[in-house]
Amino acid sequence: MASSAELDFNLQALLEQLSQDELSKFKSLIRTISLGKELQTVPQTEVDKANGKQLVEIFTSHSCSYWAGMAAIQVFEKMNQTHLSGRADEHCVMPPP
């Protein structure tokens, strides 16, 4: 896992660039992708109430960091947020340790 010193940004920073509506859409879409089964044990209300930082914590506590990055890339692409999916893909987005 990359440290924050090695990356100019992390998944939390990317999620914080989303508007409240976009973040809600991200939360909804994350469960629809094939990798979304990793989150099935997390109560929907917990995901719905989470802000960007809390969502990253949920991802990393219920799955591996590779999954979190891949899931984020897929959801950003579904949302037509290609600038975010490209940055995530290019830098292997992970939260700081």
From Swiss-Prot:
Function of the protein: May play a role in innate immunity by disrupting the interaction between PYCARD and NLRP3, thereby regulating the NLRP3 inflammasome. May also inhibit NF-kappa-B signaling distally by affecting the nuclear accumulation of RELA.
Entry keyword annotation includes Transcription: no
Occurrences of domain Pyrin (ranges): 1-94
PROSITE patterns on file: DAPIN (PS50824)
InterPro entries named in the record: DAPIN, DEATH-like_dom_sf
A Pfam short name: PYRIN
Subunit structure, interactors included: Interacts with PYCARD/ASC (via pyrin domain). Interacts with NLRP2 (via pyrin domain).
Cellular compartments per GO CC: cytoplasm; cytosol; nucleolus; nucleoplasm; nucleus
Coiled-coil region list: none
Main location: cytoplasm
Protein name in UniProt: Pyrin domain-containing protein 2
SMART domains in the cross-refs: PYRIN
Tissue and organ expression note: Predominantly expressed in peripheral blood. Weakly expressed in testis.
